[in-house]
Regions:
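Glycine-rich phosphate-binding loop and adjoining beta1-alpha1-beta2 segment
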Residues: 46, 51-88
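Hydrophobic/small residue at the entry helix of a nucleotide-binding pocket
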Residues: 33-34
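Conserved SAM/SAH-binding loop
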Residues: 97-104
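Conserved S-adenosyl-L-methionine
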Residues: 43-48, 132
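Glycine-rich phosphate/adenylate-binding loop
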Residues: 108-112, 117-125, 132-133, 137, ...
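N-terminal charged helix/coil linker that caps or initiates catalytic domains
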Residues: 1-25
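Conserved N-terminal Rossmann-fold NAD(P)-binding element of oxidoreductases
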Residues: 27-29, 52
Length: 225
C-alpha cells in the first residue's frame, strides 16, 4: 500500500511519513471545510481518524463538499465519508460517531482536533475538550458568502476581525473562562457579502480552508516531533 504514498514519502521523508501514520485526527463536521481537510490528510498519509457528524448528505451539499456524490444523498455523512476515505486507502482505521460535537464521548486518544462545525455551543465544547486535555486544535470560522482564497489563513482567535462568527465565538470563549489567546483558527479576512440572506458558497473558499487546516496539522506534527 505504500506505493500509493510514494510521492508523500519522497517529500516528507520516511521518518515524518511514519510519524503522521501514527497520529489520530478527530474531525468534527464533514462539510465543505472538514471534508476537504479529511481527504487531504488521508491522501497525504494520515490513516487514523475519528469522524463526528450528525447530519445526512443533502443534494445541496454536492456543489462544495468533496466527499459526496449523487449516490450518497440521504446517507449519514459519517458513513459516506468513511467509505470515501477507505476507497482511497483501505488501510485507514476510522471510527465514526453519529452525533453533534457536544455529545461526543470517546476514550480513544486524540492527537489533533479539527473543528469544522457551525454550532457555537459545539465549538465551545471542543475548545474545552482540547484545553482540558492538552490536545492541539484548529477551529474553522466563517467561510460562507465569500469568494477569495488568497485571504484564508491561520491565526489566533484574539487576532481575528471582520468575521461575525469569530466575534461571537471570541466573546463566548472569554465568558466561559477559556483561554482565547491560544485558540488556533482558520479565518478569511474577506468581509462576507452583506446582501446574502443565507449562507451561500461554492467549493472554492471552504475547500481552501480545509486545505489550510490539513497543511497546518501536517506542519504542526512534523515541527513538534
Amino acid at each position: 500500500m505504500n506505493n500509493i504514498f510514494e510521492r508523500s514519502i519522497g517529500l516528507l521523508g520516511e521518518g515524518n511519513f511514519n510519524l503522521i501514520q501514527q497520529k489520530v485526527i478527530a474531525v468534527f463536521g464533514l462539510g465543505g471545510v472538514g471534508g476537504t481537510a479529511l481527504e487531504a490528510l488521508a491522501r497525504t498519509g494520515f490513516k487514523h481518524f475519528i469522524l463526528v457528524d450528525f447530519d445526512k448528505v443533502d443534494a445541496s451539499n454536492l456543489n462544495r463538499q468533496i466527499l459526496y456524490t449523487q449516490k450518497d444523498i440521504g446517507r449519514n455523512k459519517v458513513d459516506a465519508a468513511k467509505d470515501r476515505i477507505l476507497s482511497i486507502n483501505p488501510n485507514c482505521e476510522i471510527q465514526t460517531i453519529l452525533a453533534k460535537a457536544q455529545d461526543f464521548d470517546s476514550n480513544q486518544p486524540i492527537d489533533f482536533i479539527v473543528d469544522a462545525i457551525d454550532d457555537v455551543d459545539g465549538k465551545l465544547f471542543l475548545l474545552r475538550l482540547a484545553q482540558e486535555n492538552n490536545i492541539p486544535q484548529i477551529m474553522s470560522l466563517g467561510m460562507a458568502n465569500r469568494f477569495e482564497c488568497e485571504v484564508v489563513h491561520v491565526t489566533k482567535l484574539n487576532k481575528t476581525h471582520s468575521d461575525p462568527l469569530a466575534k461571537k465565538v471570541r466573546y463566548l470563549v472569554k465568558k466561559s473562562g477559556l483561554e482565547v489567546g491560544n485558540v488556533n483558527v482558520v479565518i478569511s479576512e474577506e468581509i462576507p457579502q452583506k446582501n446574502a440572506e443565507k449562507l451561500y458558497s461554492t467549493m472554492i473558499v471552504p475547500s481552501c480552508a480545509g486545505l489550510t487546516i490539513a497543511k497546518y496539522i501536517l506542519n504542526s506534527i512534523i515541527d513538534n516531533k
